[in-house]
Swiss-Prot record:
Residues 203-213, 240-244 are annotated as: Dimerization of the capsid protein. A motif (Nuclear localization signal) lies at residues 74-120. One of its GO terms (biological process) is fusion of virus membrane with host endosome membrane. Residues 101-135 are annotated as: Binding to the viral RNA. This is Structural polyprotein. It comes from Alphavirus salmon subtype 2. Gene3D superfamilies: 1.10.287.2230, 2.60.40.350, Alphavirus E2 glycoprotein, A domain (2.60.40.3200), Alphavirus E2 glycoprotein, domain B (2.60.40.4310), Alphavirus E2 glycoprotein, domain C (2.60.40.2400), Tick-borne Encephalitis virus Glycoprotein, domain 1 (2.60.98.10), Trypsin-like serine proteases (2.40.10.10).
Amino acid sequence: MFPMQFTNSAYRQMEPMFAPASRGQVQPYRPRTKRRQEPQVGNAAIAALANQMSALQLQVAGLAGQARVDRRGPRRVQKNKQKKKNSSNGEKPKEKKKKQKQQEKKGSGGEKAKKPRNRPGKEVRISVKRARQSTFPVYHDGAISGYAVLIGSRVFKPAHVKGKFDHPELADIKFQVAEVMDLEAAAYPKCMRDQAAEPATMMDGVYNGEYGNIQEWRTILYSMRAAEASRGDSGRPFTDNSGKVVGIVLGGGPDGRRTRLSVIGFDKKLKAREIAYSEAIPWTRAPALLLLPMVIACTYNSNTFDCSKPSCQDCCITAEPKKAMTMLKDNLNDPNYWDLLIAVTTCSSARKKRAVSTSPVAVYDTQILAAHAAASPYRAYCPDCDGTACISPIAIDEVVSSGSDHVLRIRVGSQSGVTAKGGAAGETSLRYLGRDGKVYAADNTRLVVRTTAKCDVLQATGHYILANCPVGQSLTVAATLDGTRHQCTTVFEHQVTEKFTRERSKGHHLSDLTKKCTRFSTTPKKSALYLVDVYDALPTSVEISTVVTCNERQCTVRVPPGTTVKFDKRCKNAAKETVTFTSDSQTFTCEEPVLTAASITQGKPHLRSSMLPSGGKEVKARIPFPFPPETATCRVSIAPLPSITYEESDVLLAGTAKYPVLLTTRNLGFHSNATSEWIQGKYLRRIPVTPQGIELMLGNNAPLHFWSSVRYASGDADAYPWELLVHHIKHHPEYAWAFVGVACGLLAVAACMFACACNRVRYSLLANTFNPNPPPLTALTAALCCIPGARADQPYLDIIAYLWTNSKVAFGLQCAAPVACMLIVTYALRHCRLCCNSFLGVRGWSALLVILAYVQSCKAYEHTVVVPMDPRAPSYEAVINRNGYDPLKLTIAVNFTVISPTTALEYWTCAGVPVVEPPHVGCCTSVSCPSDLSTLHAFTGKAVSDVHCDVHTNVYPLLWGAAHCFCSTENTQVSAVAATVSEFCAQDSERAEAFSVHSSSVTAEILVTLGEVVTAVHVYVDGVTSARGTDLKIVAGPITTDYSPFDRKVVRIGEEVYNYDWPPYGAGRPGTFGDIQARSTNYVKPNDLYGDIGIEVLQPTNDHVHVAYTYTTSGLLRWLQDAPKPLSVTAPHGCKISANPLLALDCGVGAVPMSINIPDAKFTRKLKDPKPSALKCVVDSCEYGVDYGGAATITYEGHEAGKCGIHSLTPGVPLRTSVVEVVAGANTVKTTFSSPTPEVTLEVEICSAIVKCASECTPPKEHVVAARPRHGSDTGGYISGPAMRWAGRIVGNPSGPVSSSLAVTYCVVKKCRSKRIRIVKS
């Protein structure tokens, strides 16, 4: 049982029942007198008594399941008083007092009742008091519009509550609005922490609210006294018995005889979830203009009344059916039509039997079933009644399927769960129209639904049956009615086209994973969506003997109650006439009567059927529509993960799948090479892993990522060219030897060309003059000026100083272009006879020294880096060593990346269905299609397209039945069919949207950690971002790529996105994607619908009245049958695809250049340099090809105490960088590193001291890892440090180019000044 606590109002309701008698009086026994006739009471009094009884039952049930608590605490011992001694007879005081009480009770006859405590329990009062202390009102326009509650570390209030706090600490707080809930949250000041309530998890049970108890049962919350709540109570908390808050109230609405609530529930970790009721009204105070009283009442004979409380003498459908039907017809558009319908169908004046169960759900279901008394069952044509066509009481009129699951909604002519008079009955009862035109009800009908196998009947309410059926080409409904087995079979192609799913499981799912799904609603609600129109009843043909009995001249007509009998009569010497009878029994006189064409018309309307001729167009009433589609949250299964083992560069998956599970893989590089496979039973799969990484996803489990470490050979892939050549020859010799052969061939060709050129020059005549042609070397030197230099936002001299400090090689290369320019200028000045000695003299060099000195006195330290834009990549780590300062550790990591495309919705599409106008039959006459086909009744209220209307002649010759056509060839029929959207199109998961994609914006968030300070920087693809942290200046961006996984055309359906070249708007074809198109946001009745589903109207057969047509099945379902792969499976670079909004997240592509200016204030100046010495390094263990697979121990002597940064100087061998504390004396540091080769030589720098660590590494146990490795690869993606030094020694020294240029220039000038002619032999 649920724990129960009482409030004051609950005790006041129970007080008269436990009122004690007067003291000292013995109540005599009185025999029970005859019950007097109780006065008639209205519905309001009955409803109030029912509410009190329901509250009393809940309270008694709570007391029955709750143990009695002894509230008597330990006695208080008074000071300075001696305890009383025991009496002389040796009895204890307690026993004596107990005995005395028993004697008093015995003397009074045992009829003395204990006076109850007329107040709630102590626990309840304490919990309510605690909740009030943490609740604060919100004022709007001087009145309380709602409340906010302090729970845990935050303050919560409903988002619809507007206003401000009248509290000094809470007046200026700023709330954050939740995206999917009616909730706002904010942080409150720390000084109010003592007033905050503790959270608790909301489960099934009974809780304490401001206005009584609140009961939760299967995520449905009811309140027995919510009628006392007023506008402005939104946001009030409700607590458990310990005073912990489990949720806040948003509003409520009537649900049967109780009030159902919409709440926000919490758990212990303050995770919120909204339990919403669609008809709940927010309990916030509306603006002043909306506070005017609004009277919504029904009308009858110009009199207004409360729709839920009409006078039963005038409205009861069993007593006055005509008045009741008139009242329903006059109030069809009233917002409270539901209340009126329930009132007129459940207003029996007879005394109701006392029911044991008063569940609100059961009561409401009973009212829904009883509401079918406003309509009558009917008989319609069935094409197959056990082999032959017939007019069946269970004829199948409509079969609806979403196409994505096995559940069918079937409409038949009979009514399930209804008695013959229209009252609520058992589940096996079936109300139907008999062959004689009378309404019957049969119990134990054994209702069966079949396709290729028997279906599971989920629920049957009224005309509708909900069944879970296997796929098939036909549908059969069978039932036993008064001992006769009836069945009806119709052609229906039941196919299940699943949208993209990862698991095909059946049954209950124990996981917590949920997703949006579409299903038929089984909980009727009071809204227009849950109502269906009924029209005038069509006549039912019966045999004349069932209604008329003749005895010679005297004939008696038997008219069933509530019906009209009509037939043709011809007497002797009299013309043929049609007579109508409406009373119960009438007689007439007729000589030699000839009676034909008898029919019975029900007095109550029924549903319109396409298997019957067209009837009246006026809506007479609306009855419950129990199973409309709705979007719900469905739990999905999660398949158990297999055992994962590594073998070389492969991943082995071994496990057992109890049901089909989808296994998808994709590479995390540019080419995704996506694969998908359905597995079931025992399986063993081998999946190769690449160095770029691979993503595995089994069913609905979280994706798994694996990377392959490169298999390294001997030699060094990050060394000098000859070592690099040895490494590649042993790693992949075929490519290495091919490269060597091509290089040798090119070298031989170049040597031959050079020899030929020298030979030609030797035997040629050369005449060189200095003017006007310049020497070749001068032109070649001038070409160096065309080399583009590096550009930056900093001054040029700052860049030169930074290069001089950090990279002498880059400094030399950067100075090559200015030196060439200086040589050219000097050369020009010299030949213009200008003196350049002053430029190259003492003053020039002095100016240069002053500039360099100024550059060295910079006030900030700049650190530049290029970070890969991949959230899965390891973070960048570095130790900043600056002379004279303690080292600082720098970490840069990519938090997330977002690719947001600019989209335009071209149209949406969904499943198209035909809408059929019941046939218009002209007996012995001709009919024609109307000029405006939208005026046809079946098309009104719907958006139609692809409308077809044909007139068929020579139909139904001499047909006996509902058409009553006795002509042979003059009969005509109008058949009209159009295309419209399915009722499932209003659900987001069943609708596909076609987007055109334009440009995309790329954003990334980078976390920069310097010491203990973290700074978040947002960078973009279209510019440079300048950000400031705590004294940091960061310049980042732009992102090096604008890559997007989305094509120019994409399709979004549910939670998946597809790259698909959809047809343009208005160009759809039957059976293809886009056969139904619309742009309007009104998904039920779009005003711009385009449809082409291939409708073709055919000539009807003459066996029954019907509309014959064909059409093509939905193009969207056919497209889904082709099983296209969504982007969540095929997107390159490991992008995560978000459908709504349309985004690509965490794509591992591109890079972000960054520059970090660190001010001097961030550095701590060294007072004493530790000066480590006597460094020794011992490699404890080493495993190459593994992230941080090596371990080393470094020992050294520290001269002074301080801090030193430890990092690796060997490119390609990363070390776990850190800042270590150095003490005077012996020091030991243990660190880890990653080795890319079997032999590793690592240079480690500690402050300014360097130590070498050398060791041989063992092969890795596995070449597959679950995290992206930190060490580099030998794929040639970077230029190694030794190669840069090797090239720098050739061209990097600035003295080399300067001296060589000056020497060559001098020689050229000398040679050019002396004109000489060399004559060679010809």
